[in-house]
């Protein structure tokens, strides 16, 4: 005869499972009316699987659907978190509001604080120091331009050769190699910028980390602190970081000895030394600090340069005017930072490309650290992840024929007193949020601008480029990201009778 406990056990299991489902429904669809509509919310989509998949493959269409509703704010379920999407009109109000956290919005999504994913028992300084280190680097860019120029030409000659016959090259592979070599030169100096082992790590770390994060995020959040120890992408990432440590830590020791033995005023800027001194003896992960900075720098600059080159392949009529501008500005004076600032047509082409093809279709991410009532009465609940819609980049009152690519658009703005402030590439505005806006705007945009210009200068002066016949480079969208097709190719040849531009 069955005992009462034995009889009740199956029913208790059913009841328990039911309670879990009910709790999940309450958490996903809390009681009370939500003043914001959710664009991709679906009935019975308990774990938002359908909504996330829809965003993964139709993010731009969903964003446009939200904008067409007439609401100034709406929710959008993404493959990472659910965002409250705000129109760009709010950017000026929120940009410096301390009630909205920038790092608090990004760090949990990127899992930078997940113990053991990258480092343990070494504190979190490596997550905090990159903005300060990049700002320190910005002050040295005027001195670094000749060195960055030298690395750009070295890399192009190595990859594209001096052949005067047309031959095919990969756009993404070329740009990634250029950015890796140039950024390493800026951050770590001449010792590592041509080190093949380090460059391989630098080029692949960002992608490998993205794969690892995606693998972890596919599991429930309460399992993530444990499951990453067993996931192959995470284990591969930790192995790669250890290889990086075998390079960075000896380099740091050499920098410490050199800094102590030399007069500081005679030493070049070293990002390794800057962070080491910033730590003031505190324990920190020197390797992760460098990888953090490199990951951000690569993402910003490589995306921009790839898309500009692709645009030039589609608009060859811009190549000769750009080349003439470079020749007239550089002349015999070499590529200095002061001469780079005079390349206004080049800046215009870069900014117009970025306006139409930003790396992410939404931007300026924030987390509401408390309940906030905006000036128009819109209430943003505490704990809400917000992002901006990037809608003003298509505002016809701001941009004539905004859907059309116009390489001269921002150059003409320099002649209009009402719009001159919008023209510089590194200037942030609520109508152009590619670098964010306000006190949390991307500090690496100045290095990105200089590197992009130097690369384009050397290409224009020394090579002819064109699209591969029948296969123009195209973009691919996945979730909120818009990137050049990884297989994008173009044809290049060394220009006859040309010489490398002087570096300074």
UniProtKB/Swiss-Prot annotation:
Instruction: Please give the start and end residues of each transmembrane region.
Output: 12-32
One GO cellular component assignment for this chain's record is: membrane
Top-level lineage group: Eukaryota
Q: What class of enzyme is it?
A: oxidoreductase
What Enzyme Commission number does this protein have?
1.14.14.119
Cofactor(s) needed by this chain: heme
Tell me the Pfam families matching this sequence.
p450 (PF00067)
Q: Which residues bind heme?
A: 442
Q: Where in the cell is it found?
A: Membrane
Instruction: Give one GO molecular function term.
Output: monooxygenase activity
- Keyword set for this entry? Alkaloid metabolism, Heme, Iron, Membrane, Metal-binding, Monooxygenase, Oxidoreductase, Transmembrane, Transmembrane helix, Virulence
* GO biological-process terms attached to the record: verruculogen biosynthetic process
Topology class, membrane: Single-pass membrane protein
Alphabetized PROSITE patterns for the sequence: CYTOCHROME_P450 (PS00086)
Tell me the function of this protein.
Cytochrome P450 monooxygenase; part of the gene cluster that mediates the biosynthesis of fumitremorgins, indole alkaloids that carry not only intriguing chemical structures, but also interesting biological and pharmacological activities. The biosynthesis of fumitremorgin-type alkaloids begins by condensation of the two amino acids L-tryptophan and L-proline to brevianamide F, catalyzed by the non-ribosomal peptide synthetase ftmA. Brevianamide F is then prenylated by the prenyltransferase ftmPT1/ftmB in the presence of dimethylallyl diphosphate, resulting in the formation of tryprostatin B.
PANTHER family, sorted:
CYTOCHROME P450, P450, PUTATIVE (EUROFUNG)-RELATED
Q: What protein family does this chain belong to?
A: Belongs to the cytochrome P450 family.
What name is this protein filed under? Fumitremorgin C monooxygenase
Which source organism? Aspergillus fumigatus (Neosartorya fumigata)
Give the gene that encodes this protein: ftmP450-3
């Amino acid at each position: 005869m069955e005992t009462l406990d034995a009889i009740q056990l199956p029913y208790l299991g059913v009841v328990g499972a039911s309670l879990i489902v009910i709790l999940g429904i309450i958490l996903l669809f809390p009681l009370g009316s939500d003043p914001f509509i959710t664009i991709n919310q679906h009935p019975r989509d308990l774990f938002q699987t359908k909504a996330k998949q829809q965003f993964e493959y139709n993010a731009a269409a969903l964003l446009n659907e939200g904008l067409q509703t007439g609401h100034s704010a709406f929710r959008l379920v993404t493959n990472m978190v659910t965002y409250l999407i705000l129109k760009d009109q709010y950017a000026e109000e929120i940009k410096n509001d301390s009630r909205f956290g920038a790092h608090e919005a990004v760090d949990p999504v990127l899992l930078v604080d997940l113990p053991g994913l990258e480092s343990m028992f070494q504190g979190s300084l490596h997550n905090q120091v990159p903005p300060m280190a990049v700002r320190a680097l910005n002050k040295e860019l005027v001195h670094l331009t000749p060195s960055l120029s030298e690395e750009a030409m070295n890399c192009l000659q190595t990859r594209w050769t001096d052949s005067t016959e047309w031959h095919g090259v990969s756009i993404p592979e070329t740009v990634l190699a250029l950015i890796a070599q140039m950024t390493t030169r800026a951050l770590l100096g001449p010792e590592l910028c041509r080190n093949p082992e380090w460059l391989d790590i630098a080029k692949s770390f960002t992608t490998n980390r993205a794969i690892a994060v995606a693998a972890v995020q596919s599991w429930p959040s309460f399992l993530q602190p444990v499951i990453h120890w067993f996931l192959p992408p995470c284990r591969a990432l930790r192995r790669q970081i250890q290889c990086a440590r075998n390079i960075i830590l000896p380099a740091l020791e050499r920098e410490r000895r050199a800094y102590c033995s030399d007069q500081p005023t005679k030493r070049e800027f070293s990002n390794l030394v800057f962070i080491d001194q910033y730590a003031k003896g505190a324990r920190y992960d020197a390797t992760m600090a460098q990888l953090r900075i490199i990951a951000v720098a690569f993402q910003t600059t490589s995306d921009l340069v790839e898309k500009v080159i692709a645009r030039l392949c589609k608009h060859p009529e811009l190549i000769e005017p750009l080349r003439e501008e470079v020749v007239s500005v550089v002349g015999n004076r070499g590529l200095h930072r002061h001469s780079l600032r005079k390349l206004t047509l080049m800046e215009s082409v870069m900014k117009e490309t970025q306006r139409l093809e930003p790396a992410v279709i939404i931007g300026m991410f924030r987390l509401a650290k408390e309940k906030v009532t905006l000036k128009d009465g819109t209430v943003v609940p505490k704990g809400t992840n917000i992002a901006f819609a990037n809608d003003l980049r298509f505002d016809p009152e701001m941009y004539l024929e905004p859907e059309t690519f116009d390489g001269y658009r921002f150059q003409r703005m320099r002649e209009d007193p009402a719009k001159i402030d919008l023209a510089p590439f590194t200037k942030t505005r609520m109508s152009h949020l590619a670098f964010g806006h306000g006190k949390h705007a991307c500090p690496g945009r100045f290095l990105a601008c200089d590197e992009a210009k130097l690369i384009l200068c050397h290409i224009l002066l020394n090579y002819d480029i064109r699209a591969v016949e029948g296969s123009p480079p195209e973009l691919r969208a996945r979730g909120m990201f818009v990137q050049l097709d990884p297989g994008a190719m173009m044809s290049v040849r060394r220009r006859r009778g040309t010489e490398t531009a002087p570096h300074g």
